[in-house]
């Protein structure tokens, strides 16, 4: 398959791994952050950590939108959906994310009208099929998914779909990276830049990382060779004492991004003054709110939102894992009280969560090795 097979070619992967070993200074410890949760899963899925030198440490970043959502936002939306005339619609990733009083799926078991949709336009269809009810779409994601929400809001207004609104939780990636770099306990040498987000925003917004923070950043694809090539490019910059933005994912990511998608977002959203991120606290201008022109389709403007603020369960260490301070397995609950079957935190639920990735690929593998090596 074009653009897949060649990026999984064993010979090319071996050559890239050899180039990494050649470039890596054995007297230096490298800490590289992969920002995107999709990269985290690819790293574990393809076993890439096993081919890297031991002095290259990959740090998992905050690029999982479900994971960074504070519990209070889930509680706010579910409180609105307690109304029997409201249908709560969301992507499947959200269904098992716990709020204070349970996940949307658990609320569904108690009688709440909760539906899985696969796109915002599905939520509009749901509203048309249920004219006697109000459909509230729980929108989530970085700039990757925000344009589709924006276009759906424009469509709802144009077509006069009045029993539909969006509970907007879209966040932006650049302020999150800035918050990571501002953290006093985080030392990083470079970034593996997000692929999906960059298809929308392009590469230019990352230039401040190179210019002001003197950190290399390479926008990267999701195949094994993509990730290894990106590490080669970062190491080459570090060896030369350079810090710049490079685009390894040129087959998908244009330097200037997707202008039509950016325009749709600008026409429909504006920046919030601040927004709470799980593990990172309140970050200024880091999330999107719906413009007043679309107030009728904004759940937060249309209904009274409690503005609930809650803390994560005390024993859970989601914040430290999200910031890259702890590895998933270093959390006290990991693999014990917190598993994919019984998640305590969002990082164990989402398809992009680092805890879910580690559990599914590393933890299970370690348990299998232990079982096979144990005497009968």
Give names to the regions the model predicted.
Residues 129-133, 155-162, 183-187, 215, ...:
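Secondary-structure boundary elements
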Residues 1-132, 146, 150, 154-159, ...:
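Metallocofactor- and cofactor-centric catalytic cores in central/energy metabolism, strongly enriched
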Residues 228-320:
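Internal helical hairpin/lid segments
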Residues 138, 142-205:
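Phosphate/pyrophosphate-binding betaalpha-module
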Residues 6, 67, 138, 142, ...:
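Hydrophobic alpha-helical scaffolding
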Residues 167, 185-254:
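A conserved active-site cap/scaffold subdomain adjacent to cofactor or substrate pockets
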